[in-house]
């Protein structure tokens, strides 16, 4: 049978392929670089596994990299191929304030139970709880947040995977989130 491949085939050396391997136990996590990083209840550790290059317009108002300014410069796998992947580790009761992205964001619970909340079409907040390997995918522009709601040990971290589209995606905290952070003294003023 004659068959002509339609897609370009690429061969990759082992050395080059190993640059695309990230070992979880070797990843560097960061707990800062976002407007709400130090706000009580929002503490979390973010791991930049694939991509997340610093976006244009970073640190202008509430616009930032989804993983914060430090982590966005230290991807374990440094590629820009249309998507980004990271992990969040957090204790129960912890997660970011409401924010949105300029591209899709998909969450996959790896361990524990995670609550994914969003603002619905009537301006009210709704949520679903995700157990391990459950997935939710938010369209661009939808205000959302996530929180570890695992029952049991309050000192036991759980892990959430997130995948965000684009090459240098942007996150922006909502006006209400920024006002709360400012009112409580968590934003730098110039």
What is the role of each PLM region?
Residues 94-97, 115, 134-136, 140-147:
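Histidine-centered metal-chelating micro-motifs
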Residues 65-73, 84-101, 140:
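Conserved short histidine dyad/triad with adjacent acidic residue
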Residues 1-16, 143-190:
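Double-stranded beta-helix
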Residues 92, 103-115, 119-121:
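Glycine- and acidic-residue-biased ligand/ion/polar-headgroup-sensing regions
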Residues 120-140:
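Short acidic-glycine-tyrosine-enriched beta hairpin
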Residues 1-81, 189-190:
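A short, N-terminal "cap"/entry segment at the start of jelly-roll beta-barrel domains
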Residues 73-78, 96-101, 118, 126-129, ...:
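Short histidine-centered beta-strand/loop micro-motifs
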Residues 87-88, 98-99, 104-109, 128, ...:
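His/acidic/aromatic-lined binding-pocket segments of jelly-roll/cupin-type domains
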């Amino acid at each position: 049978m004659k068959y002509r491949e339609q897609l370009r085939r690429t061969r990759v050396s082992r050395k080059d392929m190993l640059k695309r391997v990230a070992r979880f136990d070797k990843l560097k996590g960061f707990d800062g670089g976002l407007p709400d990083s130090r706000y009580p209840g929002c503490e979390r550790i973010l791991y930049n596994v694939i991509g997340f290059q610093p976006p244009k317009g970073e640190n202008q108002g509430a616009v930032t990299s989804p993983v914060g300014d430090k982590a966005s410069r230290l991807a374990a796998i440094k590629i820009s191929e249309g998507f980004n992947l990271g992990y969040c580790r957090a204790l129960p009761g912890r997660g970011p304030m409401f924010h949105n992205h300029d591209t899709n964001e998909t969450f996959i619970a790896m361990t524990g139970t995670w609550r994914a909340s969003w603002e619905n079409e009537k301006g009210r907040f709704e949520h679903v709880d995700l157990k391990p390997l459950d997935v939710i995918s938010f369209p661009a522009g939808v205000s959302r947040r996530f929180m570890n709601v695992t029952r049991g040990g309050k000192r036991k971290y759980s892990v959430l995977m997130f995948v965000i589209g684009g090459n240098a995606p942007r996150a922006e905290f909502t006006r209400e989130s920024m006002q709360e952070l400012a009112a409580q003294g968590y934003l730098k003023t110039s």
